[in-house]
A protein has these predicted regions:
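STAS-like cytosolic regulatory interaction modules
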Residues: 1-52, 66-129
């Protein structure tokens, strides 16, 4: 099973953090969608930590994009953590698909948490080249 961890930080306001490690494809996309749905249904902003993710396929991207739209509609933050100190397959995929600008993506957990708590769902500081 591909590692996915879910953490709820109880600082005010509370926030849900989902950490993805390794490669994620259609096999794990369903579980990711379920975890995000639980957090959004609870009214929590969501941070997806992609720091240790090495690959995400189109199904996983679709899951993240759908969740971003759900969060936006519910006025909840939805951000991604993707450090810019190394260029990964995830960076490349976001750039190639043109989806980089659709997500609020930040190079550090601190920035992503703050932005999610502020209700951000797009923008951010992702470097894609």
């Amino acid at each position: 099973m591909v590692p996915i961890s879910v953490t709820i930080e109880r600082e005010h306001p509370s926030i849900g953090i989902i950490t993805l490690v390794g490669e994620h494809d259609a096999y794990s996309a369903g579980r990711i969608a379920n975890e995000i749905e639980v957090l959004l249904d609870t009214g929590l902003p969501v941070v997806i930590d992609l720091t240790e993710a090495t690959f995400v396929d189109s199904q996983t991207l679709s899951t993240l994009l759908s969740a971003r739209h759900q969060a936006h509609a519910a006025n909840l933050g939805f951000t991604l953590v993707l450090p810019d100190d190394r260029f990964t397959q995830v960076h490349r995929i976001l750039r190639m698909t043109g989806l980089a600008s659709w997500f609020a993506t930040y190079p550090s957990m601190t920035e992503a948490r703050d932005a999610a708590r502020a209700g951000h769902t797009s923008g951010g500081r992702l470097k894609v080249a």
